[in-house]
Structures are given as structure tokens and as C-alpha cells.
């Protein structure tokens, strides 16, 4: 229900995402979603970046990584985990500095 600006969205996966959200809610499982992210005004990582809460994303911004608050929340949730299934990076990890979220979560897993 939030605006994601120019960020990549796989529209065909929206029904699946809603099923997952509902399943987690029905099972009483906490589903952690990002609360902040690093954004730029285009896909050019050399543009000035800023970290903003996800609810303030506007149509002109592109989210390229999770923010520091989200990285910390995810790391805390991983403490003491016995099994972790990880599918994909937290952001555009191929380009610095948008690899920071993925690195932070990887360190928490290690």
C-alpha cells in the first residue's frame, strides 16, 4: 500500500506477496519489512543518496538499498537463529555504496 517511486516492482508477484503477508498474519508470525531505505533520484548510483522512511518515497525516487534502521532490525531478528533461508540481496549490491545493507545482513548471519 506504499508508493515505491521508480523502484523495480514485479507486478505479477503482488498476489503472491499478499498471500505471504496473510499467511504470516494468520500464523502469528512476524514478517519483517524494511522501514527505511536508501534512495536516489535515478538509477545512477553517483547521484546524491539519502536514507528516508519507506512511507515517504515519492514517484521520482528509486530505492536501491535498505537503510541503517532496517539493517539493524534485520540483524537483531537473526540473533540466535538456528536456520536461515536467504534468497537474494538487500539492495543493488553490485554497486557501492548500495551493498551496505547486504553486507550488514551477511555479517549478522555469520
Model regions: which residues?
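Active-site loop-to-helix "anion-binding N-cap" substructures in soluble metabolic enzymes
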Residues: 1-110
Amino acid at each position: 500500500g506504499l508508493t515505491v517511486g521508480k523502484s523495480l516492482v514485479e507486478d505479477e508477484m503482488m498476489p503472491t506477496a499478499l498471500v505471504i503477508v496473510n499467511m504470516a498474519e494468520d500464523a502469528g508470525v512476524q514478517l519483517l519489512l524494511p522501514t527505511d531505505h536508501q534512495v536516489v533520484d535515478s538509477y545512477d548510483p553517483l547521484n546524491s543518496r539519502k536514507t528516508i522512511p519507506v512511507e515517504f518515497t515519492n514517484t521520482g525516487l528509486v530505492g536501491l538499498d535498505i537503510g541503517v534502521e532496517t539493517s539493524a532490525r534485520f540483524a537483531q531478528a537473526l540473533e540466535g537463529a538456528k536456520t536461515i533461508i536467504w534468497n537474494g540481496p538487500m539492495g543493488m549490491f553490485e554497486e557501492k555504496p548500495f551493498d551496505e545493507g547486504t553486507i550488514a545482513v551477511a555479517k549478522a548471519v555469520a
